[in-house]
Amino acid sequence: MHRLYIIISYILIPLIVINTYIRILKKKEDKSRYRERFGITKIQKPKNKELIWIHASSVGEFKSCDFLINNFYEKYCILITTTTKTASDYALKNYSKKIIHQYAPYDIVLWVNKFLDIWKPKLVIWIESDLWPNTIVKLRERKILSIFLNARISPKSFIKWKYFSSYYEFITKSFFAIYAQSENDLNRIKTLTNVNVNFLGNLKLTKKNSSFKSSFTENIRIMIASTHQNEESL
């Protein structure tokens, strides 16, 4: 199934390129930065800090990871990727001194590899529901730790994924852990995959998760340190 996805994604490259230029003409895409969607950047990765990559597609998803940015930006380089110009504008307006922002590369193996070769993240955190199979699988192949935070799956998407549940499990088994934002999301995800799924609550709607946020950030520090130790032992 995944091989078919890869083939189809390559077939669609001409349409993706054409659509990108159309979006530029309509001012829906950033003319000066559209190459980032193809894994190309003008920015150099800082050499003195390990990098945490957080993917938050939209502004709403971006707000869910505010506590991660504030907890980690001093010690780690924080790379935020989004897919919309609105989210990019929001990120640069509110967090320009704390993060590096890039547009997420299109989910084509060639462009994903370019992106990963440049940034070499230590940890990747996916926010909510914007999952890209090629990217996620490439992270697994490179043994880069990934977490799915504030995870959700709508009833409509759940019905669609039920027909491809084995593929959903193939994708999500790349995650070290999944944290669902509601009990309904938890049950839907558990129906589709055997990956470790925990109930968290919606980080955008409540501040009652302060204890989780504290323990979660500490767990991330431990995971990064553990990954570093494993690399040294190799």
Predicted regions span which residues?
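Charged active-site motifs of nucleotide-sugar-dependent glycosyltransferases
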Residues: 47-52, 217-223, 232-234
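Alpha-helical scaffold segments in soluble metabolic enzymes
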Residues: 10, 188, 234
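N-terminal start-of-domain structural block
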Residues: 1-7, 225-228, 233-234
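Active-site and donor-binding regions of nucleotide-sugar-utilizing enzymes
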Residues: 20-39, 45-212, 228
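Membrane-interacting alpha-helical segments
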Residues: 1, 5-8, 12-19
